[in-house]
Amino acid sequence: METVQLRNPPRRQLKKLDEDSLTKQPEEVFDVLEKLGEGSYGSVYKAIHKETGQIVAIKQVPVESDLQEIIKEISIMQQCDSPHVVKYYGSYFKNTDLWIVMEYCGAGSVSDIIRLRNKTLTEDEIATILQSTLKGLEYLHFMRKIHRDIKAGNILLNTEGHAKLADFGVAGQLTDTMAKRNTVIGTPFWMAPEVIQEIGYNCVADIWSLGITAIEMAEGKPPYADIHPMRAIFMIPTNPPPTFRKPELWSDNFMDFVRQCLVKSPDQRATATQLLQHPFVKSAKGVSILRDLINEAMDVKLKRQEAQQREVDQDDEENSEEDELDSGTMVRAVGDDMGTVRVASTMSDEANTMIEHDDTLPSQLGTMVINAEDEEEEGTMKRRDETMQPAKPSFLEYFEQKEKENQISSFGKSVPGPLKNSADWKVPQDGDYEFLKSWTVEDLQKRLLALDPMMEQEIEEIRQKYQSKRQPILDAIEAKKRRQQNF
């Protein structure tokens, strides 16, 4: 697939989309070549910029996604200008999707490469990748930005071997009035102790995640990956810092580098600038040492794509034979225009670009592990389900469940005194109202009186939540109509 890029080098370097390009339909400016997978909030495609011939990546985000988070991601990418951070070229509104045009990194993520080759990385390879990653983090931290989701899946390599930070879906901006953040954001196994404890954190939270990523590149998965993520969340702050499973396999310099990243006290943890001076990083070799593993991974990927294409072609032939025998294979697409017909097929629409397999970790965590030799494999990008909702980490679902329980407990506190103190009072579960049969008419009337103000409060909360999601979309559409590029 990459030979297209080599045979047709860009006529000139694309730096940013101009005003004229941004007012056109995206299909007039780009040719979409193939789907790469799923990123945070949307599908990612490989495309070619018609004017320059340059390959780009386009993230297509449905507007029902959290647009505020998407705008934040765009804003952070737009402010960055570093060879170690994925570049942002511009964005479009197309029907119900937001198209974000970004730099394309042909070798994929580090975790993709590990998985495709079914091999972990050597110390030399890790040192070279860490050096570029630290330069990217040094730049971000100088700009007062925290990435908050550093892991091998978010470190991309171009075909020359240069590493770049990507996926700013949860990145944050530090301001003078908010020196530390208190929100739990990130992927559980890579999260710093202070992030989990919600005691406030700053840029060095990324350094902890980098130390975990170093272990991930060396061993194929992060520490605690074999246990339930909720257990890991409680173990990370309480246990000593993790280390290698087999320390004897690694040099003293490498182990010391990881040790300096994984200091539990953020005040004593090394910064990106300091770690760039560490002997392990200073002795890193040039990016040329990564070319062999990149070529090997790309060869594996190409062979798999060819095998998938053969399967698709074979299925097409079978479907064609069936069409000759049975015209009933042509069906109308429900909800489409009356004149639209669609070929019924057993193949998924995305079968030629994605492979599904069972991971040893829950898929919603977005983590990546080395597959067993007999497993089929997939990229770090996850296939989105039919609801097109972004995957939610299980630890966030846990906290949301706790919040729901707190809301249920507060239900009883708002009930009038006589009923609240009644021994018969109980919190209702959805669909379970059998206990009401044993109540007196007086108790039922009191309960009815208590429900009305509670319902009004819930409706108001829902209305505010709806408005908070609706307004940014309206603002963005209005801004686009005025041809003001605010991204």
Curated annotation (Swiss-Prot):
Species of provenance: Lemur catta
Matching SMART domains: S_TKc
Cofactor: Mg(2+)
Chain ranges of the SARAH domain: 433-480
Coiled-coil regions listed: 290-310
Family (UniProt): Belongs to the protein kinase superfamily. STE Ser/Thr protein kinase family. STE20 subfamily.
Notes on activation and inhibition: Inhibited by the C-terminal non-catalytic region. Activated by caspase-cleavage. Full activation also requires homodimerization and autophosphorylation of Thr-183. Activated by RASSF1 which acts by preventing its dephosphorylation.
GO BP, sorted A to Z: apoptotic process; hippo signaling; protein tetramerization
Record: residues binding ATP: L36, G37, E38, G39, S40, Y41, G42, S43, V44, K59
KW Magnesium (keyword) present: yes
Protein function: Stress-activated, pro-apoptotic kinase which, following caspase-cleavage, enters the nucleus and induces chromatin condensation followed by internucleosomal DNA fragmentation. Key component of the Hippo signaling pathway which plays a pivotal role in organ size control and tumor suppression by restricting proliferation and promoting apoptosis.
Entries under PROSITE patterns matching the protein: PROTEIN_KINASE_ATP (PS00107), PROTEIN_KINASE_DOM (PS50011), SARAH (PS50951)
Modified how: Autophosphorylated on serine and threonine residues. Phosphorylation at Thr-387 by PKB/AKT1, leads to inhibition of its: kinase activity, nuclear translocation and autophosphorylation at Thr-183. It also diminishes its cleavage by caspases and its ability to phosphorylate FOXO3. Proteolytically cleaved by caspase-3 during apoptosis at Asp-326 and Asp-349 resulting in a 37 kDa or a 39 kDa subunit respectively. The 39 kDa subunit is further cleaved into the 37 kDa form. Proteolytic cleavage results in kinase activation and nuclear translocation of the truncated form (MST1/N). It is less likely that cleavage at Asp-349 is a prerequisite for activation as this site is not conserved in the murine ortholog.
One Pfam family per UniProt: Mst1_SARAH
Primary location: cytoplasm
EC number(s) reported in the record: 2.7.11.1
Active site feature: D149 (proton acceptor)
The protein, known as: Serine/threonine-protein kinase 4
Phosphotyrosine modification, residue list: Y433
